[in-house]
């Protein structure tokens, strides 16, 4: 090595030799290279060889001067020294601590015995640093502090001042210098020598350069590392194959060949990974969102809820609630169940090991298998042997993430899929029918749009997701044994590159998919492959029914009478029975037509997106689909059951679903109503016959299932020992056998949750929630009926304006979702003036208006059943009569004859000739004062009259702003001197009922009240003084008018339009001038051509949506008379407005309103 160094130095000093000479020297160096005698590696330098030999010998010559740590490489010791704190590297300022530490510190270094490969010696080991040789080649380091003090005492005699080595300052005393250095500079001083520096990095460099030396261990002493003896090579054997390794990590890497590579598990959810950084990235999913601590949470961020309970984001630091099996991945509720499950794996492995050893013996292998099954209390499978790797019957159905709600909650971390805003994804039906995908960046569930699904469908087969690939039973990937980790996967990375970095891997075949949903769909291929290997179709269904032991899971069967997950998920029955899924073409039935009933193509996203079209009312269902049930002759029994449920929905169930989804009745659990309750439903007899046929087929299929299971149980009893009762994993027929009475009684004690839309039943409300959400597309976010809008900050649909904009035309919620009969038009169409009063030449309603009212939609007329009975006179009729006598002379006002009632407020009055003399009506019914001028000015008040001729004018044009007579008839008080009639006096307010019966009673009371008022007007005595013509006599009907005013206010009130509140007060106020006029002076019922008029109150609207929103106000039933003080206050505010009307010609001023006595 020395010669090579000398040659290298000569080459550096002198000129570069020629290439020939250089190549000759290089060849000489290669020939003289140093090789290892153990492994054969060659090195150009001896130092490199000596460092390499430490790997074989385990020598660690480099020792830490501050602890007992040793290292084989100098760089490793440098890294170790930096791990020490700075306080252990520098010398303490206290004299006792410093002296004790320096006195105890000994370095096993010799002056002449240094064995470093580089021949480097420490500078502090020489005599220059004050080291004195001791016995046994030991060196005792003197305290540098004592050394400095001795030098300082010698200098005090010669020099008067002491300089500072850092800032060149001088001090008279040594103590002052030390205080200055300690306070101003704070230097770092080496504990092993007198080296002092101001930088910590300089101190570390000094220790690495001067104090790190190598030492050869004495004899065959074992090197000690952190107090543990160094193990000799070849001391780590493999327990499986017996191969020995010198290092533990070599053995750990070797053990991956004998077991699964998922060695890194999550302690929260139990998921396992191959690499540690995968686990590290996975642990971020259990924490809060990235950046959520720094930014404030906006109102638009979705809130995670479970059953409408807000879930706060917390960092999960606890352990998992479930125990995970590391060999098969099943979940268990406690450790005892996991230990019992692991015993199965151990017995299976032990049986595999004993099988080759017992082959040479005379024992039959069948006896060994029989003994193993008897130990597990299992009956042998008669049809055929199951492969050793098969896990049939061992998977827990309740914890299957594909079929179970509980495992689905674990997989989604308790966050239920809920759209952030309903309007963001279009209509509600489209949102329910869309596909749900989990966005890993936003960590929320999103709805896949229709355009994206269309692009996926239109994409070529090469770019299609793996779930679209057709798989046939002859596929080599599916035909053989399902190895969890197959060796050949050529297209795995290619498909992963197209997945945009977000993939889900199938644990059975190793394929990678872009989304977890695609992987779930792909798993059906493996389920069909397992079913193809099984001769009977019942094996696949029983594989998910339960675990090996009853203690594997605390969850019990989720459906009454069935422990199978198929009963809770009807879509799984199609996957188990039908081979024509999304990845294969459905085979035609025996009749030549495809089996559309059982193919899973009906639940594809395209069919779900158009699912709302299948729930419409009317005759859009073709008769051939109703009369011809598409049931194949070769269809299995389970498919017949599914077919019967599907075909029944095409019959009467189809119409009932549509009614229940939009506006269900108050008895949702009732049976299917008769066809007489339907609206134009065709082919009722064919539907009935179809239903009977399907019921018989369903009963026949159930008998087949029960017979098949009894036969299977009988075979199991014959094969097992007579004193042992075999464990039935399916538990499907436990109710039919005598041995299952105990289980039947336990299951009967549980609460059964039936579906209100079909015959589905389950023990778990969560499963019922998912069933209604998926199959019936019902929003189950609340317990309210589906026609009520969801509450909360997201429920934009609960607003009245949203209801108007969405175009909802069904019956109001107050009627319980039932259609009510339209009001009869005959009680409004009068053709003669009652009582033969003068002025009967007033025209009746035009024919066009009647035709328009008759042709109005039913849903508009159905809202007219309002609380008409409230307008009947109360028990204060006599008090009103006494308060109305002699308060105003008859000559102060002019009374017009009574006009005929009109059907709508938009009808115009025909011109009638005026009368020069005063003409009074024989009937004392009150009339509104008519104010008519010869030529009305622009700023004059609009005129409203009942239809009689005016006084002082030769001709009065018809007034188009007149209010409807039906409203006036309801607002008219009782005549003077007329006692309360039997039909209207003291009519009580009926209680609020949500049924149709309450609405019919309200309409009957309203009809009676209207008829009694007409009779009262006809039977009034002709000699009664017309004292009701003045304005001061109208407040006499105090109780009656207050009722009418309160009702009319809220009947015409729209929450988004506060102007309607003032219009309601203006119309219903007791003042005569404000009967048809609002506070702003504009008439309330200005009906122009093309307006939409309310048939109840006569108010006109410009848009049909406004009329629909207004008609909902008529369905409100008030149970009290309302506040009386507010009415008096409002009436008093109208008084100044009445006083300003004295300037209008031909009018009579009305005094301020006041409360009657």
Swiss-Prot record:
Q: Where is this region: Disordered?
A: 1-26, 449-503, 523-653, 831-996, 1013-1040, 1123-1157
Question: Where is there biased composition of kind Polar residues?
Answer: 494-503, 550-561, 601-612, 914-928
Where is this gene product found? Nucleus
Q: Where are the zinc fingers (C2H2-type)?
A: 34-56, 62-84, 162-185, 188-211, 236-258, 264-286, 323-345, 504-526, 753-776, 1092-1114
| Per UniProt, location of the Glycyl lysine isopeptide (Lys-Gly) (interchain with G-Cter in SUMO2) cross-link in this chain | 630, 669, 1032, 1051
- What's a Pfam family in this record? zf-C2H2
PROSITE patterns assigned to the protein according to its UniProt record, in alphabetical order: ZINC_FINGER_C2H2_1, ZINC_FINGER_C2H2_2
State what this protein does: Transcriptional regulator that binds to the promoter and activates the transcription of genes promoting brown adipose tissue (BAT) differentiation. Among brown adipose tissue-specific genes, binds the proximal region of the promoter of the UCP1 gene to activate its transcription and thereby regulate thermogenesis. May also play a role in the cellular response to replication stress.
The UniProt subunit note reads as follows:
Interacts with PRDM16; the interaction is direct and may play a role in the transcription of brown adipose tissue-specific genes. Interacts with PWWP2B. Interacts with HDAC1; this interaction is enhanced in the presence of PWWP2B.
> Which named protein is this?
Zinc finger protein 516
Q: Provide the species name.
A: Mus musculus (Mouse)
| Gene designation | Znf516
């Amino acid at each position: 090595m020395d010669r090579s160094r000398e040659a290298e130095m000569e080459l550096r000093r002198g000129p570069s030799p020629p290439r020939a000479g250089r190549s000759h020297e290089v060849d000489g160096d290669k020939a003289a290279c140093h090789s290892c005698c153990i492994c054969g590696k060659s090195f150009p330098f001896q130092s490199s060889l000596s460092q390499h030999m430490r790997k074989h010998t385990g020598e660690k010559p480099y020792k830490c001067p501050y602890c007992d740590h040793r290292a084989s490489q100098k760089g490793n010791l440098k890294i170790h020294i930096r791990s020490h704190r700075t306080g252990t590297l520098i010398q303490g300022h206290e004299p006792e601590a410093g002296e004790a530490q320096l006195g105890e510190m000994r370095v096993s270094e010799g002056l002449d015995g240094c064995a470093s490969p580089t021949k480097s010696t420490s500078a502090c080991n020489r005599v220059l640093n004050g080291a004195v040789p001791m016995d046994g080649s030991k060196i005792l380091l003197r305290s540098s502090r004592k050394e400095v003090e001795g030098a300082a005492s010698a200098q005090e005699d010669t020099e008067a001042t002491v300089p500072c080595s850092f800032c060149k300052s001088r001090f008279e005393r040594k103590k002052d210098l030390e205080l200055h250095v300690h306070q101003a500079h704070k230097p770092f001083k080496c504990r092993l020598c007198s080296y002092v520096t101001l930088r910590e990095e300089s101190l570390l460099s000094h220790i690495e350069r001067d104090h790190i030396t190598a030492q050869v261990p004495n004899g065959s002493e074992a090197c000690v590392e952190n107090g543990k003896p160094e193990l000799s090579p070849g001391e780590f054997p493999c327990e499986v194959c017996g191969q020995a390794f010198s290092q533990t990590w070599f053995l750990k890497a070797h053990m991956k060949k004998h077991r699964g590579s998922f060695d890194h598990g999550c302690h929260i959810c139990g998921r396992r990974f191959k690499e540690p950084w995968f686990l590290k990235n996975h642990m971020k999913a259990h924490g809060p969102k990235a950046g959520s601590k720094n930014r404030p949470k906006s109102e638009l961020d979705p809130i995670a809820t479970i059953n409408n309970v807000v879930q706060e984001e917390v960092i999960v630091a606890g352990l998992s609630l479930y125990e995970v099996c590391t060999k098969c991945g099943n979940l268990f509720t406690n450790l005892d169940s996991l230990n019992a499950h692991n015993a199965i794996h151990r017995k299976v492995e032990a049986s595999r090991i004993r099988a080759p050893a017992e082959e040479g013996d005379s024992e039959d292998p069948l006896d060994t298998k029989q003994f193993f099954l008897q130990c597990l209390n299992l009956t042998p499978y008669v049809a055929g042997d199951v492969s050793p790797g098969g896990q049939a019957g061992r998977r827990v159905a309740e914890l299957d993430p594909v079929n179970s709600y509980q495992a689905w909650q674990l997989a989604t971390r308790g966050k239920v899929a809920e759209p952030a805003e309903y309007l963001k994804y279009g209509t509600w039906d489209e949102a329910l029918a869309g596909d749900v995908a989990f966005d890993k960046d936003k960590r929320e569930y999103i709805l896949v749009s229709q355009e994206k699904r269309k692009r996926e469908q239109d994409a070529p087969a090469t770019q299609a997701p793996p779930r679209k690939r057709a798989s046939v039973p002859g596929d080599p990937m599916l035909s053989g044994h399902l190895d969890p980790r197959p060796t050949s996967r050529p297209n795995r990375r290619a498909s992963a590159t197209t997945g945009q970095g977000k993939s889900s891997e199938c644990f059975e075949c190793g394929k990678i998919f872009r989304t977890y949903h695609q992987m779930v769909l792909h798993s059906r291929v493996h389920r069909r492959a397992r079913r193809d290997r099984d001769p009977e179709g019942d094996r696949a269904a029983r594989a998910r029914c339960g675990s090996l032991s009853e203690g594997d899971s605390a969850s019990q069967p989720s459906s009454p009478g069935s422990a199978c997950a198929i009963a809770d998920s009807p879509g799984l029955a199609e996957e188990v029975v039908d081979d024509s899924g999304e990845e294969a073409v459905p085979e035609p039935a025996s009749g030549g037509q495809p089996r559309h009933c059982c193919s899973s193509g009906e639940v594809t996203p395209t069919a779900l997106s158009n699912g709302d079209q299948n729930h419409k009312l009317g005759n859009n269902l073709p008769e051939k689909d109703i009369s011809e049930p598409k049931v194949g002759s070769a269809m299995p029994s389970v498919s017949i059951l599914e077919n019967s449920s599907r075909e029944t929905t095409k019959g009467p169930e189809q119409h009932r679903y549509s009614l229940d989804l939009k506006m269900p009745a108050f008895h949702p659990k009732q049976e299917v109503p008769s066809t007489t309750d339907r609206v134009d439903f065709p082919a009722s007899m064919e539907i009935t016959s179809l239903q009977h046929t399907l019921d018989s087929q369903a009963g026949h299929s159930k008998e087949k299932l029960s017979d098949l299971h009894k036969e299977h149980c009988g075979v199991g009893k014959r094969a097992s020992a007579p004193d042992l009762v075999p464990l039935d994993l399916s538990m499907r027929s436990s109710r039919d056998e005598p041995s299952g009475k105990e289980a039947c009684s336990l299951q009967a004690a549980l609460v059964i949750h039936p579906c209100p839309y079909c015959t589905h039943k389950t023990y778990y409300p969560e499963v019922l929630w998912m069933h209604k959400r998926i199959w019936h597309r019902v929003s189950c976010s609340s317990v309210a009926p589906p026609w009520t809008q969801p509450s909360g900050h997201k429920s934009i649909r609960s607003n009245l304006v949203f209801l108007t904009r969405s175009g909802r035309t069904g019956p109001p919620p107050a009627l319980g979702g039932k259609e009510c009969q339209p009001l009869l038009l005959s009680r409004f169409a009068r053709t003669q003036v009652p009582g033969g009063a003068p002025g009967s030449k007033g025209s009746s309603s035009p024919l066009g208006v009647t035709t328009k009212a008759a042709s109005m939609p039913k849903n508009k007329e159905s809202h007219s059943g309002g609380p008409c009975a409230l307008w009947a006179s109360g028990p204060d009729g006599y008090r009103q009569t006494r308060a109305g006598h002699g308060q105003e002379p008859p000559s102060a006002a002019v009374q017009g004859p009574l006009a005929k009632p009109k059907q709508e407020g938009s009808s115009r009055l025909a011109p009638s000739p005026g009368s020069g003399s005063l003409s009074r009506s024989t009937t004392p019914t009150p009339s509104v004062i008519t104010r008519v001028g010869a030529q009305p000015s622009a700023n004059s008040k609009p005129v409203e009259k009942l239809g009689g001729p005016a006084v002082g004018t030769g001709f009065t044009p018809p007034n188009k702003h007149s209010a409807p007579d039906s409203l006036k008839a309801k607002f008219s008080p009782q005549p003077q001197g007329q006692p309360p009639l039997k039909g209207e006096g003291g009519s009580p307010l009926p209680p609020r009922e949500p049924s149709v019966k309450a609405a019919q009673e309200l309409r009957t009371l309203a009809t009676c009240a209207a008829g009694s008022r007409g009779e009262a007007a006809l039977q009034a005595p002709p000699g009664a003084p017309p004292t009701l013509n003045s304005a001061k006599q109208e407040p006499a009907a105090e109780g009656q008018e207050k009722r009418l005013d309160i009702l009319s206010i809220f009947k015409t009130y729209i929450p988004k339009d506060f102007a309607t509140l003032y219009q309601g007060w203006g119309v219903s106020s007791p003042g005569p001038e404000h009967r048809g006029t609002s506070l702003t002076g504009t008439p309330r019922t200005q009906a122009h051509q093309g307006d939409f008029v309310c048939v109840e109150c006569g108010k006109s609207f410009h848009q049909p949506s406004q009329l629909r929103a207004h008609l909902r106000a008529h369905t409100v039933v008030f149970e009290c008379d309302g506040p009386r003080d507010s009415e008096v206050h409002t009436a008093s505010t109208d008084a100044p407005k009445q006083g300003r009307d004295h300037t209008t010609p031909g009018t009579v001023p009305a005094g301020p309103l006041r409360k009657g006595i």
